[in-house]
């Protein structure tokens, strides 16, 4: 499945939730939906990340693709920006590490300039929320559906 298809699945889920969330009066139930959305978001990011790495490796060499698929089989949400750089991209060499860092920095600067928020902080927060909800059944106060 192309990595973009994973995002379409999440977009469909969010479209459904947009219609439902305003009808929920119970803050506890609303927080449960937010927690499940955080889990879904990180799952989508993880699947997309796996697809990008595996597709790249398969284009390079079939055996590298097999190795990469096995390597990424159990990353289980370990997809923070630092982990992507240090545990995953670094294995492919400095050229790709620099390219990733440049791309992330350009995106971060553009979003900060146009939206006034950090895409990296937002991304990291979603992972934190997912971990809190998945492992402890609770969400930080900073996590809301809005």
Task: Write out the residue ranges for each language-model feature.
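Short, hydrophobic, well-ordered secondary-structure elements
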Residues: 31-57
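Flexible secondary-structure boundary motifs
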Residues: 60-142
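A structural signal for well-ordered alpha-helices, especially hydrophobic packing surfaces
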Residues: 14-21, 48, 130, 134-137
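Generic structural signal for well-ordered, non-transmembrane alpha-helical segments
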Residues: 8-11, 15, 39, 43, ...
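Short hydrophobic interaction/assembly module
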Residues: 15, 50-68
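Short, flexible helix-adjacent loops and helix caps
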Residues: 22-26, 53, 57, 138, ...
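Charged alpha-helical initiation segments
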Residues: 1-36
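Short, intrinsically disordered, charge-balanced linker/junction segments flanking boundaries
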Residues: 144-146
